[in-house]
């Protein structure tokens, strides 16, 4: 079967941001079902430090995470001055060492643990990328094996993970979180924190002083460390997509993982741009700390003992934090972060149950005030943050959110949980209100506002609209892609054509398709409300098939995510591709299967004429552009009208052109081109006349002439006017 294609003309704008942000406020809770680690954005509800740290006066947390350890001596030498400076603050030395291998009985490790350090997981052998060689089992084994090894250290329980090379390549993947992090090791162990996503502070955050986000040379202070343009000796980061922007807060990935986003730059990113131990790196780290304190977030610093940063620079950063902010800044190791989240935020609960499964905790903004709240089924507790008072308010939680879908079913923007068997729980006026409802015909689905009316629909095999008056779901006639269940893990919802409505990318082990949401009705084109515009669809074996989003089987998540107007894939089969990822831009997706431009020679060959006739090529780009009419003059000049301004003008102004061409060597090909007249309003006709030319450019018929001999018109007269403009194609 060959893929089915529909032609589509579209203009794609520049990248509109890091991640896809749904237009409808009713979709503010879809992150709970999003497997991507890159969904937070600048305006996403935040979990500020006072909400979870459990210590009065502390406004920001700093973690110091040093990577790559496989022997103790080198790390002791590098860290010792840093540890001693930390001890001067409160007697502790809270540093986390992201470790590959270490002897569990190494005596140095016990010294560190007593001082306040923790030993965390960095895989057994540091593969870059982790997913490679077409061997998922290799990746899982080096992660879980590292966790089991470090658990043999007396007094050490590893809780955190950092992905090797996460600061220099696309080694991080949704496949890792869904199929490795969220599982348990052979020893039944699991982790609680990842710290591999990088947060870029940008000048788009208008709450920050300009000097914090722009350096003395006028460059973006933090974006510059991810260079986009190739330069000798510099690794370009043009396709590096392991980032979020302006969100220095912990967040939850795929329900079971706390993400502590890393600060840009790491010491590797700094040396890549400005060399080893450059003073500018320390200056920018200090500004990152300033930002963290102002935003009441976390600064998670990535560094190594490889000479990219010096010990003294780390000591100076600690010294700056202590002297500038005092007790407002708290240094913690990752075990302390996990403990404080569970004690002070979750009241003794956890994202994961004793066996590593989903404990039902949901971190979400219940009242749409911009701050995260929590529901904790093990404690039957709802906790809502009172930002003005700076404290939590609590109320009972009368249901278990596991198996339920969250969304907005009320114009008040209140959060609801929907039980597809016949109950809706809505949080309003600080309590949960229970509503018995008539279930939809589809019992499996998710809540998502697809028509942007501010109320979520129930998406299953069909689209079901909420009827609040009768407390029921009504099946709509909106078009759904054939044989596609809208809760399928092989679907990604994203606005491909920037019309404000979510479109569908679908790809599983047998089928794939690209479907645009359509509001218009056009029976001839097959357009009906819903996902009726089929850009392309086909079978897995089709040439050019969209890579799988879900591959089925035991480990289905295939590592797809949306970022910067692209869909990306990172898995064990992409490691040999450029930047270790597969990718499709939105422009490519919308042009899927469309005809590609032909060379002038190939275009000539494509013509078919009757016997006795032939087609000769006399002019092509770049001598002409967007030609719509031509005529010869008695002097042999070829006059051409160009409508490059169709259909909306150029920057809103007329941009049509008339030019003349000459065949200087008499070979039949017009190689010299001169612009005669510009700024015409959609010209569609030209005729040599007298000493000049006649041009039809509605509403006018114009006579233009060159009287100076420079080849350009200096006389322009309107001979007739008043012609109806209408559609340029219908003149």
Task: Identify the function of each model-found stretch.
Residues 36-39, 44-47, 54, 88-90, ...:
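C-terminal domain-boundary segment and adjacent tail
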């Amino acid at each position: 079967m060959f893929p089915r294609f529909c032609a589509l003309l579209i203009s794609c704008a520049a990248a509109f941001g890091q991640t896809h942000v749904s237009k409808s406020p009713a979709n503010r809770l879809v992150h709970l079902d999003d497997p991507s680690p890159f969904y937070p954005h600048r305006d996403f509800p935040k979990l500020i430090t006072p909400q979870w740290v459990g210590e009065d006066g502390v406004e920001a947390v700093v973690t110091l995470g040093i990577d790559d350890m496989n022997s103790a001596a080198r790390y002791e030498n590098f860290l010792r001055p840093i540890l001693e400076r930390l001890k001067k603050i409160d007697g502790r030395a809270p540093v986390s060492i992201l470790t590959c291998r270490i002897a569990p009985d190494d005596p140095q490790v016990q010294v560190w643990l007593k001082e306040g350090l923790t030993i965390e997981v960095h895989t057994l052998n540091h593969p870059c990328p982790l997913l490679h060689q077409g061997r998922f089992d290799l990746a899982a084994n080096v992660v879980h094996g590292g966790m089991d090894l470090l658990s043999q250290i007396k007094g050490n329980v590893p809780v955190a993970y950092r992905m090797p090379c996460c600061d220099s390549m696309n080694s991080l993947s949704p496949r890792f979180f869904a199929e490795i992090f969220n599982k348990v090791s052979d020893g039944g162990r699991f982790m609680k924190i990842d710290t591999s996503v990088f947060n870029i502070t940008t000048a788009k955050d208008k709450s920050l002083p300009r000097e914090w986000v722009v350096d003395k040379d006028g460059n973006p202070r933090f974006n510059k460390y991810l260079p986009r343009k190739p330069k000798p000796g510099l690794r370009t980061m043009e396709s590096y997509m392991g980032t979020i922007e302006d969100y220095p807060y912990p967040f939850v990935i795929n329900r079971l993982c706390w993400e502590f986003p890393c600060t840009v730059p790491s010491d590797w990113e700094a040396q890549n741009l400005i060399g080893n131990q450059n003073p500018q790196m320390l200056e920018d780290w200090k500004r990152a700390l300033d930002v963290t304190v102002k935003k009441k977030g976390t600064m998670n610093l990535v560094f190594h003992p490889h000479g990219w940063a010096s010990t003294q620079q780390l000591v100076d950063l600690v010294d700056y934090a202590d002297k500038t902010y005092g007790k407002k800044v708290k240094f913690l190791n990752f075990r302390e972060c996990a403990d404080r989240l569970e004690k002070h935020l979750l009241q003794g609960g956890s994202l994961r149950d004793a066996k590593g499964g989903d404990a039902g905790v949901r971190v979400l903004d219940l009242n749409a005030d911009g701050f995260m709240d929590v529901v904790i089924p093990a404690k039957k507790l709802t906790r809502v943050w009172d930002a003005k008072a700076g404290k939590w308010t609590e109320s009972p939680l009368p249901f278990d959110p596991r198996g339920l879908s969250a969304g907005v079913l009320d114009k008040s923007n209140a959060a609801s949980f929907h039980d597809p068997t016949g109950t809706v729980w809505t949080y309003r006026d600080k309590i949960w209100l229970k509503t018995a409802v008539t279930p939809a015909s589809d019992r499996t689905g998710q809540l998502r506002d697809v028509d942007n009316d501010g109320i979520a629909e129930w998406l299953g095999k069909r689209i079901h609209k909420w009827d609040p008056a009768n407390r029921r779901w009504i099946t709509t006639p909106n078009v759904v892609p054939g044989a596609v269940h809208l809760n399928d893990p092989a679907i990604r919802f994203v606005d491909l054509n920037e019309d404000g409505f979510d479109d569908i990318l679908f790809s599983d082990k047998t089928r794939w398709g690209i479907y645009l949401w359509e509001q218009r009705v056009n029976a001839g084109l097959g357009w009906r409300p819903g996902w009726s515009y089929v850009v392309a669809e086909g079978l897995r074996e089709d040439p050019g098939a969209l890579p799988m989003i879900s591959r089925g089987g035991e480990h289905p998540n295939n590592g797809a995510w949306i970022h910067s107007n692209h869909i990306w894939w990172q898995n064990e089969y992409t490691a040999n591709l450029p930047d270790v990822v597969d990718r499709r831009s939105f422009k490519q997706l919308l042009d899927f299967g469309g005809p590609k431009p032909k060379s002038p020679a190939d275009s000539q060959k494509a013509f078919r004429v009757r016997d006795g006739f032939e087609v000769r090529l006399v002019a092509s780009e770049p001598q002409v552009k967007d030609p719509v009419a031509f005529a010869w003059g008695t002097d042999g000049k070829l006059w051409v009208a160009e409508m490059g301004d169709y259909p909306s003008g150029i920057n809103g102004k007329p941009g049509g052109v008339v030019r003349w061409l000459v065949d200087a060597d008499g070979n039949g090909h017009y190689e010299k081109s001169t612009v005669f007249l510009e700024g015409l309003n959609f010209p569609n006709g030209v005729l040599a006349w007298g000493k000049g030319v006649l041009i039809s450019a509605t509403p006018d018929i114009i006579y233009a002439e060159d009287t100076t001999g420079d080849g350009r018109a200096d006389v322009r007269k309107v001979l007739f006017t008043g012609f109806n403009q209408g559609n340029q194609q219908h003149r």
